[in-house]
Amino acid sequence: MRAIEEGADFIETDILSSKDGVLVCFHDVILDDTTNVANYKEFADRKRTYEVQGVNTTGYFIVDFTLKELKSLRVNQRFSFRDQQFNGKFQIITFEEFITIALDAPRVVGIYPEIKNPVLINQYVKWSGGKKFEDKFVETLHKFGYKGSYLSKNWLKQPVFIQSFAPTSLLYISNQTDLPKVFLIDDVDIPTQDTNQSYWEITSDTYLDYIKQYVLGIGPWKDTLVPVINNYAMTPSDLVSRAHARNLQVHPYTYRNENKYLHFNYSQDPYKEYDYWINNIGVDGLFTDFTGSLHNFQEWTAPNHHDNTASKLLHEIALLASPYE
């Protein structure tokens, strides 16, 4: 909700599933790092070792807990250098609760949910009728009225981008919805989780020509677009220009304000980083942990800083929106 207050156009979340098939918002497949699960004696025997993207991983896996059990936990801030005052105060929320936050906002706020780790989820969570994780994901969006291709009237009422690192998931749901999809691309040494394809294969001209039939854009890790050596951003790759040549949007991730994430080229100034990526690299959108700073940058650098045309347009779009039934 704070992101909405700070001006976010879209709010982003990763979607996983509980043991009993309820879709929830959570970043990791294990609960260890960002919840207090280790404090619960009744869950002490739940620790497991599963293969996750080719790596044996041990922890308290979200797929081994029912929604009721997940709701009994409280979440914590992952990074020790960030504000810790909210640790232990909030529950894990469901996908439906997340959607409601966006729909209840006083203006149009889009959502940007990720189909997260579908290989693992489909392996350990089973739904009636042979349905898959991806089916339940799309059903949830349809239930709340999300429909329509990019920039269509229906899409503008309730904007959404569907993202995933798993290309087979995006291809699978392309037969169920025309909502815009974004293919996420990991670091150069991490293959795709479902097809085991290398970074170089999925960023080749041949693959971009293939995937553009199913997605609106790509979402690469930003340090693969502009390689980094000794904390200096180097010469950009040509991936953005090759994507744009195929009418693919580019939405890199993740931009953060802390000094440890800002390369020396930007003099520890996040506004310089935004300026470089938006005006030099020419990205079409980006993921940030600091909505307020990006929103301020957009406001301060708008061609007509005092022109409220954009605000009026957003208000008109908001008037088109109706609550889901």
Stretches with model-predicted labels:
Residues 1-325:
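Phosphate-group recognition and catalysis centered on beta-loop-alpha active-site segments
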